[in-house]
Amino acid sequence: MHTLFIVLLIIDCIALITVVLLQEGKSNGLSGAISGGAEQLFGKQKQRGVDLFLHRLTIILAVIFFLIMIGISYFGL
């Protein structure tokens, strides 16, 4: 049981890191904050397609991560 939780945790961590790295950046960095940052503030657009899928998958994988960690600590593994 302990090995199963650890393997699931490792798979979830690798998937979570991969999904986060696949997402596009939401800001232009420091240059976007200094000049032209208001465009993002007022021109906020809804996510569509792949961006929306990656965003939702990130949330799902994060919830699974925390559930596995709670399971490991609850069962004292």
UniProtKB/Swiss-Prot annotation:
GO terms for molecular function: protein-transporting ATPase activity. InterPro entries: SecG. The chain crosses the membrane at residues 2-22, 57-77. Belongs to the SecG family. It comes from the Bacteria. One of its GO terms (biological process) is intracellular protein transmembrane transport. It is a multi-pass membrane protein. It is found in: Cell membrane. This is Probable protein-export membrane protein SecG. NCBIfam families: secG. The keyword Transcription does not apply. Pfam families: SecG (PF03840). Its main location: membrane. GO terms for cellular component: plasma membrane. Involved in protein export. Participates in an early event of protein translocation. Keywords: Cell membrane, Membrane, Protein transport, Translocation, Transmembrane, Transmembrane helix, Transport.
